[in-house]
Amino acid sequence: VRSSAASDVYKRQAYEVFDKDGSFLAVLYTDFHPRAGKRSGAWMTSYKEQWIENGVNSRPHVSVTMNFTKPSAGKPALLTFSEVNTFLHEFGHALHGMFANTTYSTMSGTSVYWDFVELPSQIMENFATEKEFLNTFARHYQTGEPIPAELIQKIVDASNFNVAYALSLIHISEPTRHS
């Protein structure tokens, strides 16, 4: 990833993304902190889809927008598990767009059928509880210790709580459809 000074707005938040062989993949814009006039929440935006026309591969421009708390004087901004999960979800959409390689922009990135559009982002969410992934960056900001495996397991267990009950409610609400 190479930083790009595309405009003052994204001076430190625009990145030209290259494949391992050095070929240009996309422009990624990031906007991580709240400011006056910015709506709340998190989202991915595709400013320019990918497409191929007359042998020329037009690469996408995408953004990931979050509203992480800004760091304060002498203290880092720490992310909650929910914020990490949301970031991974939106980054999954961005990856879907950046890795697109199709003839028609209408089938590129998140412009796919609705039954598939969430798949890459939901796959990315799984990294939030992968010890190997977390150990690369998720450390206590004062001691440098990694997140204990027991805590990661508690998060996984909590996310699976009542799953069978919820599934049974779906079956009860529409038994013939979910048989």
Label every model-predicted segment.
Residues V1, A5-Y10, E174-T176:
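Short, small-residue-biased leader/transition segments that mark boundaries at the very start
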Residues R2, T80, V84-F87, F116-P120, ...:
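Hydrophobic (often cysteine-bearing) scaffold residues that line and stabilize catalytic clefts
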Residues S3-S7, G97-T106:
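Surface-exposed helix-capping loop/turn segments at secondary-structure junctions
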Residues D8-K11, E16-T86:
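Active-site-adjacent "gating/activation" loops or surface patches in catalytic cores
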Residues F18, S23-F24, T30, A100-L169, ...:
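Acidic/histidine-rich catalytic neighborhood
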Residues G55-S72, G92-A100, G144-I152:
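Active-site-adjacent bridging/hinge elements
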Residues S82-G97, S121, T176:
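Active-site recognition of the HExxH zinc-binding catalytic motif
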